UniProtKB/Swiss-Prot annotation:
Cofactor(s) needed for function: [4Fe-4S] cluster; [2Fe-2S] cluster
Job of this protein: Catalyzes the conversion of dethiobiotin (DTB) to biotin by the insertion of a sulfur atom into dethiobiotin via a radical-based mechanism.
Gene name linked to the record: bioB
Entry's Gene Ontology BP terms: biotin biosynthetic process
Record text on subunit structure and interactions: Homodimer.
Protein name per its UniProtKB record: Biotin synthase
GO molecular function, one term: iron ion binding
Ligand binding ([4Fe-4S] cluster): C55, C59, C62
Source species, domain of life: Bacteria
Length: 347
């Protein structure tokens, strides 16, 4: 019997899963994964930053915050033709979804028609579309949906009780409100967080509890491992134990059985062996390409070699004109180069 989809997880239940002996936790997570997905199929994603740097927020992990000296230069919003050129390249390389990220606290209303034109153009190429632009109003979310947007990324970042240690310029409720606007507009959600920012295991549990308690589980759950960037307040933080990261993947898979669980930022520093454990634990999505926002990502050749060694295949997707997934196929996220309001830690 397939694992039930629950929205009533309790903190002590998820904590008990985290605390299981490592082999037992992986066994349980792998079993849940196989109930809902082909374990040999992995969703492949890349990102294009359509507006880099200059963000007014103070997220302690983010090299795009203008208040930190990180060497990231602010750039204006890209022209639509330049974005579409990147989208064509992505499609030619086998992409099926193109994601556009902008380093904004929230887009201004005057920005929406420009982004909508990008979305419509990408959609016309036959690609799925996703975006991460910061906080959205309900009207903005509907405008993006009308333009052809399929997915919207907006992360919770961390547990509610640790959030104020990381961010002061945006409230947790602001994030929940944006997710509500996105769902109400009929968009699919991509929502996860970052680990390795000094939080406790109980707070990692709290992040997963917040995600699994949303009215609808996110379609994609990116689990980012902190990429320490010189100039940001979190540079020099203690490194997260690799097995703790795998535990995070495993409990995410058990708590949200039908969501795509994505290895996101931080994968560049992971060994092939660690990534293999993550796939065994239920990860079935990665970011692919040479850059992930403003931080590195494993070279494409390394990813292809790892897939070959493990016998993994990229997922395919077929989406109808209204953006609905067909049957057993799942998205193969696509984009191009670098940020959004996931900064170094992405969609």
């Amino acid at each position: 019997m397939a694992a039930a989809i629950r929205h009533d997880w309790q903190h002590d239940e998820l904590q008990a899963l985290f605390d299981l002996p490592f082999p037992e936790l992986l066994f349980r997570a792998a079993a849940v994964h196989r109930e809902h997905f082909d374990p040999a199929q992995v969703q492949v994603s890349t990102l294009l930053s359509v507006k880099t740097g200059g963000c007014p927020e103070d997220c302690a992990y983010c090299p795009q915050a203008q208040r930190y000296s990180t060497g990231v230069n602010a750039q204006k919003l890209m022209e639509t033709d330049a974005v579409l050129a990147k989208a064509r390249q992505a499609k030619a390389a086998g992409a099926s979804r193109f994601c556009m990220g902008a380093a904004w606290r929230s887009p201004k209303d005057r920005d929406i028609p420009k982004v909508a034109a990008m979305i419509a153009g990408v959609k016309a190429l036959g690609l799925e579309t996703c975006a991460t632009l910061g906080m959205l109003s309900g009207e903005q979310a509907r405008a993006l949906k009308d333009a052809g947007l399929d997915y919207y990324n907006h992360n919770l970042d961390t547990a509610p009780d640790y959030y104020d240690s990381i961010i002061h310029t945006r409230q947790y409720q602001d994030r929940l409100d944006t997710l509500e606007h996105v769902r109400d507009a009929g968009l699919k959600t991509c929502c996860g967080g970052i680990v390795g920012m000094g939080e406790t295991r109980a707070q990692r549990v709290g992040l997963l509890l917040a995600l699994a308690s949303l009215p609808a589980h996110p379609d994609s759950v990116p689990i980012n491992k902190l990429v320490q960037v010189a100039g940001t307040p979190l540079h020099g933080s203690a490194e997260l134990d690799p097995f703790e990261f795998v535990r995070m993947i495993a409990v995410a898979r058990i708590a949200m059985p039908r969501s795509m669980v994505r290895l996101s930022a931080g994968r560049e520093a992971m060994s092939d062996e660690l990534q293999a454990l993550c796939f065994l634990a239920g990860a079935n999505s990665i970011f692919y390409g040479d850059k992930l926002l403003t931080t590195g990502n494993p070279e494409s050749e390394r990813d292809l070699a790892l897939f070959a060694r493990l016998g993994l295949q990229p997922m395919a997707v077929q989406v109808d004109a209204e953006g609905h997934d067909h049957g057993g196929t799942v998205h193969a996220d696509i984009s191009a180069d670098t940020p959004g309001c996931g900064c170094a830690h992405a969609a």
